[in-house]
Amino acid sequence: MKCFKLVLLCVLAGLLVIAAAPARSQQMKPQPLTLGLQCTGGDCPLLKGIPQTAGMRSGFVRLEPGQTVGWHTTGKNEESLVILKGRGEARLEGQAARPFSAPALVYIPPAMKHNVANTGREVLEYVYVVAPATNVP
């Protein structure tokens, strides 16, 4: 009987916690915000996805001459790079490198392995935006 009362007490406590918590849709509703672009080097995430956004991620990258971000893929997501400063190239697996210089926009389709390199003599700075692709074959 003592064990039954303990289990019942735990169940009731759990129900109270669930009832007191806001609805999941209210917890995950993204809110407008403004972020600075201070980054001392490498990849500095800005928007980290759910629940901060509805699925989009974003960050600021600062590469010294000769540096790369490394080969990677964004899976089923597409990516845009907004080039703010410097020169570089987008290296896409199986394709010729695509050189760019600021100001520029680079688009990378879903599931494409890629790398970004600073090929210039000054710092390369860009903002990346990764978002779920809704029309992936």
Residue ranges of model-derived segments:
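A short, N-terminal "cap"/entry segment at the start of jelly-roll beta-barrel domains
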Residues: F4, I18-R57, E64, G70-W71, ...
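Bacterial N-terminal signal peptides
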Residues: V7-I18
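Short histidine-centered beta-strand/loop micro-motifs
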Residues: L47-I50, V69-T74, L92, A117-T119
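Short strand-connecting beta-turns/loops that link adjacent beta-strands
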Residues: A54, K76, Q95, R121-E122
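Exposed loop/turn and edge beta-strand positions of beta-sandwich/beta-sheet ligand-binding modules
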Residues: R57, N77, P110
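A short beta-strand-loop-beta hairpin characteristic of the jelly-roll/cupin
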Residues: T68, E78-A102, M112
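Ligand-binding loop in jelly-roll beta-barrel domains
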Residues: P110-N135
